[in-house]
UniProtKB/Swiss-Prot annotation:
Function description: Involved in mRNA degradation. Catalyzes the phosphorolysis of single-stranded polyribonucleotides processively in the 3'- to 5'-direction.
List of residues binding Mg(2+): 488, 494
Annotated stretches, region: Disordered: 702-728
Alphabetical UniProt keywords: Cytoplasm, Magnesium, Metal-binding, Nucleotidyltransferase, RNA-binding, Transferase
Top-level division of the source organism's lineage: Bacteria
HAMAP family found in the cross-reference section: PNPase (MF_01595)
Official protein name in the record: Polyribonucleotide nucleotidyltransferase
Statement: the UniProt record of this protein carries the keyword Hydrolase: no
Primary location class: cytoplasm
Length: 728
């Protein structure tokens, strides 16, 4: 009899077999589920506090996705040889799991909940994010914690007009779409995607297809819960204090209505603070001992009712716009004189200063991912300091939100970047959010595209992004173009769409309620396209195309090709040759395994010199050619003469002059410059040289050392011109 009450469910999901089990591992957690998809295995656990902390006024959900290096048969690098701070991918995947789970916890549930997902085995072809999301949903479902799930998820690709369900990494390499969709049986809750300029219809079709296919996983979770689930918690939300609601409404409602007639954010924020203070004072005067959290929730509900009612009633939005109007746009390029490219993009009260920097191959980011090391030539970093919203706060390493926003903006721009062989530079974009009132990630997309063009990056098309909102009450709904921060906060769905004139490059949706249909999403995407095209028009008017010249402060680059066998000669022993080259010419030199060499410098002369010297190092000595040589060493029977970098040959004593030479020191000395002819090269690469043959061909002469400076007379005719000749 086993000590474990192990429950296993297995199902076929597209091309993959999925196995879920609970009851054996991590039994002291509230819920624990192992998910195995073709050898990619995750352990998902959830624990919830039995009661909320005193004064808790928000739902404290924490999601940690952790990749263990042993999952891929690796040992961590670094001094301590153990996993450290989360990688960017771990942070992004944690957010991916958090977003569809958070809306499904009941209103008023303020207990701490921690979801931890460990990747314990990885098949490099099967990404772990979808198994992790399914596992987290299943762990919550079996735990009995109040949760309106389960959630399913799927990755959708698109190639040759066909949707791909949970494609492998190899299949994703040629797919025009990478879309992750998550939701419940009845509704889509989250979409995260990157696309190669696809139409709205194709994108919506992918969302619908993904929602259909995830039902297989949802049904399997239901089966797992029936056999291995724990009893549901006996939890109910605290009863509403109707007397308090009435009192707060009496004081706050007229004041809040006044506040939401103020069009400027700073004035409105100040007024809302005054309203809150007035409510607190009125309650104290009435002798009501009210909980601050409860009062705050009532105020939030009143604000939502006012804003949502105004919009659904056809009244102007918070800042006076109708539902389709984009805020005024101002664009300025070349803002920073020493930066390689820069743009200031302002849309209403949201502003991004985006700066582009061009670098060389050595500036690429090397990412030691669980599935294998790779290099990234395009980076986008998003920063939002507290002053952007008129607040004080911590300044330092990026938070999860900043990493997520930067990733979304990056995904929007990747499809229009030139290929490596067209533009060999490493590119870094930094978006500094200097003002924020909604849609700062989409401002980063617009400003990022303009900064790239200002830097001379030949992007394929302009890319613009717009953040949309949606308010749904029964059968009535309103789609909002270019939402404000308050509209995002008080709405039912926010989605961000970025793309070109030809199609969508990135789409992100977060839906807080059920009941948003395919038809509503269709209307929302059509309105988003209208807004995107309006912004694209403004951008194209400000900068029609990328600059044809790079900034004077950006490095120039040339590429050349050598035989791969010659790479070691360019590098030299212990890197001595290439180090000397870079130092003496003031260049950066990168060598690929296929023999492609990239030389970069702000000095054109330095690049040309480095190229010339590399050509000399890699040049092949040709029999019958005459070279400038330097005597390196004298021997009894001849001399060692260098004719090319790394190419030394033997000048035999019989090949110096036609007469008999008794002592070589009578004719040659170390350091002496000579014109010598290569007369033989054997299969081992040994070279035989002749001074007398060169003299005979060029018509020069040589005198004994003791007769003066022994040097061949200059030839009357020009010698054969080679790159190696020019080097000397």
């Amino acid at each position: 009899m086993s000590m474990f009450n192990k429950v296993v469910k297995q199902f076929q999901w597209g091309q993959h077999t999925v196995r879920m089990e609970t009851g054996e591992i991590a039994r002291q957690a509230g819920g624990a589920v192992i998910v195995d998809v073709e050898d990619t295995v995750v352990l998902a656990t959830v624990v919830a506090a039995k009661s909320p902390k005193p004064g808790q006024d928000f739902f404290p959900l924490t999601v940690d996705y952790i990749e263990k290096t042993y999952a891929a048969g690796k040992i961590p690098g670094g001094f301590f040889k153990r996993e450290g701070r989360p990688s960017e991918n771990e942070t992004l995947t944690s957010r991916l799991i958090d977003r569809p789970l958070r809306p499904l916890f009941p209103e008023g549930f303020y207990n701490d909940v921690q979801v931890v997902v460990h990747v314990v085995s990885l098949n490099p072809e099967i990404p772990a994010d979808i198994p992790a999301l399914i596992g987290a949903s299943a762990a919550l479902a079996v735990s009995g914690i109040p949760f309106n799930g389960p959630v399913g998820a799927a990755r959708i690709g698109y190639k040759d007009g066909q949707y791909l369900l949970n494609p492998t990494r190899s299949q994703m390499a040629t797919s025009d779409l990478d879309l992750v969709v998550a939701g419940t049986e009845r509704a889509v809750l989250m979409v995260e995607s990157e696309a190669n300029q696809l139409s709205e219809d194709v994108m919506l079709g992918a969302v619908v297809y993904g929602h259909e296919q995830m039902q297989i996983a949802i049904n399997a979770i239901h089966d797992l819960v029936r056999e291995g689930g724990k009893p549901e918690w006996d939890w109910a939300p605290a009863p509403k204090n109707e007397a308090l609601i009435a009192k707060v409404t009496e004081v706050a409602l007229p004041l809040l209505q006044e506040a939401y007639q103020l069009r400027q954010k700073s004035a409105r924020s100040q007024k809302l603070k005054e309203v809150s203070a007035n409510v607190t004072a009125a309650l104290a005067e009435a002798g009501v001992d009210a909980d601050k959290v409860e009062v705050g929730n009532i105020m939030f509900d009143l604000e939502a009712k006012i804003v949502r009612g105004q919009i659904l009633g056809g009244e102007p939005r918070i800042d006076g716009r109708d539902t389709r109007t984009v805020r005024p746009i101002e664009i300025r390029s070349s803002v920073l004189p020493r930066a390689h490219g820069s743009a200031l993009f302002t849309r209403g009260e949201t502003q991004a200063l985006v700066v582009a920097t061009l670098g060389t191959k050595s500036d690429e980011q090397i990412i030691d991912a669980l599935a294998g090391e790779y290099r990234d030539r395009f980076m986008l970093h998003y920063n939002m300091p507290p002053f952007a919203t008129g607040e004080t706060g911590r300044v330092g390493s990026p938070k999860r939100r900043e990493i997520g926003h930067g990733r979304l903006a990056k995904r929007a721009l990747i499809p229009v970047l030139p290929k490596d062989d067209e533009f060999a530079y490493t590119i870094r974009l930094v978006s500094e959010i200097t003002e924020s009132n909604g849609s700062s990630s989409m401002a980063s997309v617009c400003g990022g595209c303009l900064a790239l063009m200002d830097a001379g990056v030949p992007v394929k098309a302009h890319v613009a992004g717009v953040a949309m909102g949606l308010i749904l009450e029964g059968n009535k709904f309103a789609v909002l173009t270019d939402i404000l921060g308050d509209e995002d906060h008080l709405g039912d769905m926010d989605f961000k769409v970025a793309g070109t004139d030809n199609g969508i490059t990135a789409l992100q949706m977060d839906i807080k309620v059920q009941g948003i249909t395919k038809e509503i999403m269709q209307v929302a995407l059509a309105q988003a396209k209208e807004g995107r095209l309006h912004i694209l028009g403004a951008m194209q008017g400000a900068m029609g195309h990328a600059r044809t010249e790079l900034s004077a402060h950006a490095p120039r680059m040339i590429t050349m090709k050598i035989h791969p066998d010659k790479i070691r000669e360019v590098i030299g022993k212990g890197g001595s040759t290439i180090q000397a080259l870079t130092k003496e010419t003031g260049t950066t030199i990168d060598i690929q395994e296929d023999g492609t060499i990239t030389i970069a410098s702000t000095s054109t002369d330095g690049m040309a010199e480095a190229k010339r010297r590399i050509e000399g190092i890699t040049a092949e000595a040709e029999v019958g050619k005459i070279y400038n040589g330097t005597v390196l060493k004298l021997l009894d029977f001849g001399a060692i003469v260098n004719i090319l970098p790394g190419k030394d040959g033997l000048l035999h004593i019989s090949e110096i002059v036609n007469e008999r030479v008794k002592d070589i020191k009578d004719w040659l000395k170390e350091g002496q410059q000579l014109r010598v002819k290569l007369i033989q090269a054997d299969e081992k690469g040994r070279l035989r040289l002749s001074l007398k043959a060169a003299l005979a061909e060029e018509g020069g002469s040589i005198s004994p050392v003791n007769a003066g400076e022994a040097a061949p007379a200059p030839a009357p005719a020009a010698a054969p011109a080679t790159p190696s000749d020019q080097q000397q």
